[in-house]
Amino acid sequence: MMLGLSALSLFLFSCNDQNSLEQQSEAIIRKHTIRFTEPPKRIPNRNSVDAPLLGNGFTGVALAGPPEAQTFYVARNDFWRLKSALDESYPLVLGKIELSIPALEGASYLVEQQLYDATTTARFTKDNQSVSYKTYVSATEDLLVVELEMDGEGSIEGHVNLSLPGEKEIINKPPLERVFPDEREVGITKEGVLYLWRAFEDSVDIPTKAAMALRMDQSSDGSFVLEPGKPVRMVCAFSSNFKSNDCVSDVIGRASDCSSSHLKEVEKHHQEWWKDYWQKSFVSIPDSVIEKQYYLSLYGTASCSRDKDFPPSIFGTWITRERPNWNGDYHLNYNHMAPYYGLYSSNRIEQADPYYMPMLALISRGNYYSEKVTGIPDGILLPVGAGPLGIETTRRSPFMDTYFKG
C-alpha cells in the first residue's frame, strides 16, 4: 500500500513539476513581442531582410509591403538550382502571395510577432475602419494560415493572388549575373484553388521543383469582401519534389481539403510544438534586451532549421532575390558554423542536426581534393562553398576560367 502511495505521489509530483515548467517558460517568453510600426525597406534583397519572418524549418515566409499591398515572399530550404559550378547553384524564390486591399492606402501599420506560439498579427487602421489578420506557418504541416477580419462601418473589398518572381526578384545583368532557364506555371483550378510552381531541370546536376497552392474561403477567383464580425480565411500549402512525387497535385489537394475542423487541429498542434520547443530549456536574466534577443534567435532558428538534408542558407530560409550574395551557400567557415554555436547548450538538437549534412555529402569530393591538392590519400579537403546534396558552389567551370582568371 505504501508502495502504491509512493508511486502516486511521484506521479503527482511529476505532473506538478511539468505544469510548473510550462508556466515558467510561458511567463518568460510571452513577455517578448517583436513589433514593426512601418513596412520593411530592405526587401526584396540579396542579403538578409528587415521584415517580419515566419517559418517551420522547411518553408520560410517574409512579410513585405504597405497595408494596401501586403506581399508574402515564400522560399523553401529544399528549393535550389543544383549545379556544381561557380555561381550556378543557389537557393531560389518560390513565389509571392499578394494581398491587395486598395481601401487601406494611407492606413497606419502595425505588425507584431508573438514568439511563444509563433503567431504574427497585423492591424491596419484608416479613419473609422481597421483590417487585421493573424497568420502562422504551421510547425507540423507545410501550411500558411491567414485569418482576416475588419472592424468599423461598411465593408472592404480585397483580392489575393499568387505570382512568380519577376524583375524585382531576379537579377539579370550578364555576363556576370546570369539567369538560368526554369519551367514555371501559375494558374487556378476549376474549384478556385490558386497555384504556382517552378522547376529547374535543364542543365543541372539534380532536378528541383517546388509548388504552392492557396484557397480563399468562399472565393472562386481570389476576390473577397470583409465585413464586421465575418472573418475570412486563406490557406496556402507548400511542397517540393523532395517531399512528394507530384508536388503540384499534393499542394492543390491539401489546400482544397483544409476544413475548419482540420485547421483547428493544425493550430492546436502548432501551438503544442512551440510550447514543447520552449520547454527544452529557458532562462531569465536581468537584462531584458539580451534576453529578448536570445529568444528571438531561438525563434529564428526553429523557423528555418529542421530539414536535415537542406539546412538554411547563409541568409536563412528567407530568400527574396536571386542570386543571393555568395550564392546563399553553406560557406564552410564561421558563416555556416556560427548560427549553430548555441544549439547544444540550449538543448535544441533537432535544429543543430542539419549543420552536418552538406559536409557529409561532400566526403567523396573531399577525398578527391585531398589527394589531388595535397597529395594525401584518404583525407578530406572540402571546398569553401557547399550546397545541399553534395553540390559545390565554387567548383571550377568555363565561366570561372573566363571571368575570374586571377
Name what the model sees in each region.
Residues G4-S6, L54, Y294, H336:
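Hydrophobic alpha-helical segments
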Residues M1-Q23:
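Bacterial Sec-dependent N-terminal signal peptides
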Residues N333-Y344:
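Well-ordered alpha-helical segments within folded domains of soluble proteins
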Residues N347, P354-G406:
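Active-site lining segments of carbohydrate-active enzymes
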Residues C15-Y330, R348-Y355, M359-E371:
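Acidic/polar, glycine-enriched structural segments that form the non-catalytic walls/loops
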